[in-house]
Amino acid sequence: GNAIDIAHNIKVAKNLTDVHFRGEYWRTPKKYHNLTKTSVYSVPEFPDYPFLDPHWIIRVDGSCEIGPNAVPVFSPYGYDTAENIKEFIPKVFEMLGSGARKAIFDKQFQELAFSEIQSSMSKSVMIERVKKFLPKINPKEITEKGTAGIRSSVINENGKFIPDVILLEEETSFHILNYNSPGATGALPFSAHVINQLHKKSLFESEDIEAQCGPWKFNDIIEKLEK
């Protein structure tokens, strides 16, 4: 959430900005834990944007959740009203002065934002989106909120959401922007790739190239990534 701000502070990636979205979840009671054998994902209603619609998630402990939505917020820490009010004016001015202006005035984006805000204000609205493919779910039986998380998506000067991670190398800094889930599930190989790039450019020195973490061996990962 702060990666763009750090880059901007040293005059890097000034053509990019970020917008923040809070993903919220609802936990289901135990009677639903055997409803499916796997998580179930729907086709996103707005495929031009980097969000998955609320889906059915089976956690490693066997519990199940519905979510997430993608509620626009004004801070990477915008979990409550006070934080969003504090950051509202500076974030709006930042967005209006960047490519995000084109995005927020786009009709499809406005439809997405309105839909996601509705799903945050109403539990039933969110759960009904999952009920389309799991009709046995009863919103009245789901009363416990799950964990929320905030992701920051990068927008370019043309008002387009950038789908991929951005690596920017400067003389005295190296920036990783727009690195979000589900890409973050490849964190260990990606970390090895970043370290390898820094090492090649003499921005990082290490003699421990045989380093190993559990089944992960640095040299083996790099060899496979560079094939």
Name these PLM-found stretches.
Residues 8-10, 134, 199-202:
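A broad structural signal for alpha-helix termini and local helix breaks/kinks
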Residues 1-85:
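Flavin-dependent oxidoreductases
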Residues 5-7, 127-131, 195:
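Generic solvent-exposed, charged/amphipathic alpha-helical segments
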Residues 199-227:
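Active-site-proximal substrate-binding core of FAD-dependent oxidoreductases
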Residues 15-23, 27-31, 102-181:
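Flavin (FAD/FMN) cofactor-binding core of flavoprotein oxidoreductases
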Residues 18, 64-124:
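Dinucleotide-binding/catalytic capping subdomain of oxidoreductase cores
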Residues 1-4, 126, 190:
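Mid-domain beta-loop-alpha active-site segment that forms a flexible
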Residues 55, 68, 77, 174-198, ...:
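A conserved FAD-binding loop/helix module that cradles the flavin
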